[in-house]
């Protein structure tokens, strides 16, 4: 039941709010107002202070939830402002403190696999991401007042330059509330992946070839009707631990380069690649 799912998410969240040491300082989480399906998350790399702001939508029922992620900060792992299915990780939510396990798992490809000497960890990139989150998303301070700090001279100019170079319109900016309100709540139907034969259900967190999909499982399909924000079906990307690829998309989208890579085409390839469909 959806009620059981939100109750479990709330319980998990309250636990590590009471015990912040359990997060190891790697993430900060807040629900979107009173909506316990939608979560604001700041992933944090404590050695460099690099942060990535993202949204998680967790819906369905407590036995077979679906997970949709949208990164709001430029990064070298996931495309910005694109919806990515993380439903292949839904088995983590079945555990005690499952929300914490899920967040730890998402944290790893963002920071852990790449060496700290890489471009995305340079001081200028850390400065850029801090400025981006606070300038583009005005509600950032509402959800994470403890992270605000102060902007520095030049912050507005680097954010404006990056937006222009990557054709990111101001419609992506403003408050997160405005950002989310651009999607309409309506009824959708989707085919959830079948995890009944998932060999990783009881495995430890780690890099694997777990496949995720929302609509290409032809065996024992289970159809869920739900009311959710419309981004659930807009250019959805499927993701496993090794790759990202489109599920339903009218056109392909390239992952945005890191800020330091804007003018530096070195031909180096990130470990996250697209699969050709």
UniProtKB/Swiss-Prot annotation:
Signal peptide: none annotated. Residues 254-277 are annotated as: Disordered. One of its GO terms (biological process) is protein export from nucleus. Disulfide bonds: none annotated. One of its GO terms (cellular component) is nucleus. Not known; its elevated expression suppresses the conditional cell cycle defects associated with UBC3/CDC34 mutations. This is Ubiquitin-conjugating enzyme suppressor 1. It comes from Saccharomyces cerevisiae (strain ATCC 204508 / S288c).
């Amino acid at each position: 039941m959806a009620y059981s799912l939100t109750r479990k998410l709330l319980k998990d969240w309250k636990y590590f709010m009471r015990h912040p040491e359990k997060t190891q300082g790697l993430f900060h989480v807040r629900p979107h107002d009173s909506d316990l399906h939608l979560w604001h998350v700041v992933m944090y790399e404590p050695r460099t202070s690099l942060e990535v702001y993202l949204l998680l939508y967790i819906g369905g029922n407590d036995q077979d939830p679906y997970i949709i992620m949208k990164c709001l900060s430029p990064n070298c792992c996931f495309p910005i402002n694109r919806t990515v299915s993380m439903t292949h990780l839904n088995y983590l939510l079945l555990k005690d403190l499952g929300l914490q396990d899920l967040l730890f798992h998402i944290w790893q490809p963002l920071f852990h696999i790449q060496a700290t000497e890489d471009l995305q960890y340079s001081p200028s990139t850390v400065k850029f991401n801090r400025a981006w989150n606070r300038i583009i998303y005005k509600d950032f301070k509402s959800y994470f007042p403890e992270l605000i700090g102060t902007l520095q001279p030049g912050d507005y100019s680097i954010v404006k330059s990056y937006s222009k170079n990557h054709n990111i319109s101001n419609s992506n900016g403003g408050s997160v509330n405005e950002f989310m309100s651009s999607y309409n709540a309506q009824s959708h139907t989707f085919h959830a992946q079948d995890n009944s034969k998932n060999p990783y259900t009881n495995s430890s967190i780690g890099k694997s070839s777990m496949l995720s999909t929302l609509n290409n499982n032809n065996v024992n399909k289970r159809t869920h009707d739900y009311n959710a924000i419309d981004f659930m079906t807009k250019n959805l990307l499927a993701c496993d631990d090794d790759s990202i690829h489109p599920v339903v998309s009218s056109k392909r989208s390239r992952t945005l380069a890191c800020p330091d890579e804007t003018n530096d085409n070195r031909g180096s390839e990130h470990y996250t690649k697209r699969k050709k469909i």
